[in-house]
Curated annotation (Swiss-Prot):
The Rieske iron-sulfur protein is a high potential 2Fe-2S protein. Its cofactor is [2Fe-2S] cluster. The gene is petC. This is Cytochrome b6-f complex iron-sulfur subunit. Its EC number is 7.1.1.6. It is found in: Cellular thylakoid membrane. Belongs to the Rieske iron-sulfur protein family. It catalyses: 2 oxidized [plastocyanin] + a plastoquinol + 2 H(+)(in) = 2 reduced [plastocyanin] + a plastoquinone + 4 H(+)(out). Pfam families: Rieske (PF00355), TM_PetC (PF25471). Disulfide bonds join 112-127. Keywords: 2Fe-2S, Disulfide bond, Electron transport, Iron, Iron-sulfur, Membrane, Metal-binding, Thylakoid, Translocase, Transmembrane, Transmembrane helix, Transport. Residues 71-161 form the Rieske domain. GO terms for molecular function: 2 iron, 2 sulfur cluster binding; electron transporter, transferring electrons within cytochrome b6/f complex of photosystem II activity; metal ion binding; monooxygenase activity; oxidoreductase activity, acting on paired donors, with incorporation or reduction of molecular oxygen; plastoquinol--plastocyanin reductase activity. PANTHER family: CYTOCHROME B-C1 COMPLEX SUBUNIT RIESKE, MITOCHONDRIAL.
Length: 178
């Protein structure tokens, strides 16, 4: 096969240039539109070394153990933003200890946020009356399952929430949410 001399190589024509420009523009717009869709299906990166996400307060600020313990008494169950942005109860076990697990506040019946009733010492769903004990185990329906659990860890005074993969200590079974 012989090569053409440099002077004989045809340049890019107007039609070819317009096709290339159109293809490049359409490709750029399509990639820009697909980026959020693809990003939606990629799980968020872990914030802590334990593979969890940083717990956030109602203002979206990271929760610190020292700050939380100074404003919440022993036995308190208060909401933070946990995994996937779900409301999660942090449990204060003592004057200087946050519990090693958190309780997801989403009712397993229809998805309402279940408030903690400190007077009755249980979680009571306002939507259809489901009740859960202090550990989130269902004690009265119509909710079919106990509230989901999450691991809670403290690293350098920062509180992290991560996926619960252990056996559910309330039932002795594999967790339904894992």
């Amino acid at each position: 096969m012989t090569q053409m001399p440099a002077g004989d190589v045809p340049g890019m024509g107007r039609r070819q240039f317009m096709n290339l420009l159109t293809f490049g523009s359409v490709t750029g717009v399509a990639l820009g539109a697909l980026y959020p869709v693809v990003n939606y299906f990629i799980p968020p990166r872990a914030a802590g070394s334990g593979g969890g996400t940083s717990a956030k307060d109602e203002l979206g600020n990271a929760v610190t153990a020292s700050g939380w313990l100074s404003t919440h008494p022993a036995g308190d169950r208060s909401l933070v933003q946990g995994l996937k942005g779900d409301p999660t109860y942090l449990i204060v076990e003592g004057d200087d200890a946050i519990g090693s697990y958190g309780i997801n506040a989403i009712c397993t019946h229809l998805g309402c946020v279940v408030p903690w009733n400190s007077g009755a010492n249980k979680f009571m769903c306002p939507c259809h009356g489901s009740q859960y004990d202090a550990t989130g185990k269902v004690v009265r329906g119509p909710a079919p399952l106990s509230l989901a659990l999450a691991n809670v860890s403290v690293e350098n005074d920062n509180v992290f929430v991560s996926q619960w993969t252990d056996t559910d200590f309330r039932t002795g079974e594999k967790p339904w949410w894992a």
